[in-house]
Each structure stands twice: as C-alpha cells, then as structure tokens.
A protein has these predicted regions:
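Short, basic (Lys/Arg/His-rich) helix/loop patches that form interaction surfaces
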Residues: 77-83
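Core AdoMet radical
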Residues: 1-71, 84-93, 113-117
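Auxiliary Fe-S-binding modules of radical SAM enzymes
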Residues: 90-151
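Anion (oxyanion) recognition and catalysis
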Residues: 22, 79, 105-109
Length: 151
C-alpha cells in the first residue's frame, strides 16, 4: 500500500486508519515524511506494527528544537536500521549553511539517515549543492563523515 500523503498522525481518524493498515498485513510505503512532532507512544507502537521497509520524517526548520527532541525520543521505538529511518532536511530556505550542516550531523549522531533537499536549487549557493551531493550519496557520506574534508 503506497500512501501518497501519509500524515496520518494529524488525522482525527488516525487510529482507525492505522489499524486498517495493520490488519491488511500488506507492506506499507509511507512515501512522504510523517510529522514526528505529533508522535506519541501509542502512534509509534501502531507504526511499528505495520509492515514497512522505511520511515520518513522531516526537519525543515532548524529553529524547531521540538522536532529534534521528538526524533531523538522516538528513534529507539522504530527497530529499522539507520539507513531505513530517513529524515528530510530542507535547505536554502530560512537557514544558514551552518544550521543545515548541524542538522545533518545531529541526525546522523542519533541514528537517522539525513536526506538533504534543496529549496529552489537554482538559487542555492554551491556549498549547499555540495552538501546535498555529499549527504545524499551514501557511499561518500559513510566513507567521509566530515563535510569539511569532502572534496
């Protein structure tokens, strides 16, 4: 089952919809980022009961520390490997390069696989495009963990 807008966590009928997914015993593809800010222990438990190969979350605003705290709090609730728990990192939109890089490092440190998305890529500075190339190419990202050393 491919969910094109899977923000079930914000839906008033989230519990019934999640139960339908669980009962279906089908593989569930949450194609967009689930809103971690709305996560509770009950919601995490129901997501864990779904057959899924990957989870996506997002951390768009570097000033939003609640998002990071929730990501940190619930990482252990999802038993998927690090490379199967992705977090979209919006860049080139109300953030500095330093803030973008800090989010990438912090997410990696707590067990998520960051995925850099560049807003209006054609206007982005070269270092932002390089950050995206470094972070999203997982062979490079794992081989060279320090962006400053990436050539």
């Amino acid at each position: 089952i491919k969910l094109l807008d899977p923000n079930l966590l914000a839906c008033s009928e989230w519990k019934e919809l999640m139960q339908q997914l669980i009962d279906s015993k089908a593989w569930v593809d949450f194609t967009q980022g689930l809103d971690i800010r709305l996560m509770t222990a009950e919601k995490a438990d129901m997501i864990r009961q779904c057959k899924t190969k990957m989870l996506h979350f997002a951390w768009d605003n570097p000033e939003d520390e609640l998002t990071f705290e929730k990501l940190k709090e619930y990482r252990k609730a999802f038993t998927l490997p690090d490379d199967k728990c992705k977090v979209y990192v919006l860049t080139n939109f109300n953030s500095t390069h330093e803030q973008d890089l800090e989010r990438v490092y912090r997410l990696r440190d707590i067990g998520y696989d960051p995925f850099v998305m560049v807003y209006e890529k054609w206007t982005a500075p070269k270092k932002t495009r390089r950050l995206q190339r470094w972070c999203n190419n997982k062979i490079i990202f794992r081989a060279e963990p320090d962006f400053a050393k990436y050539k």
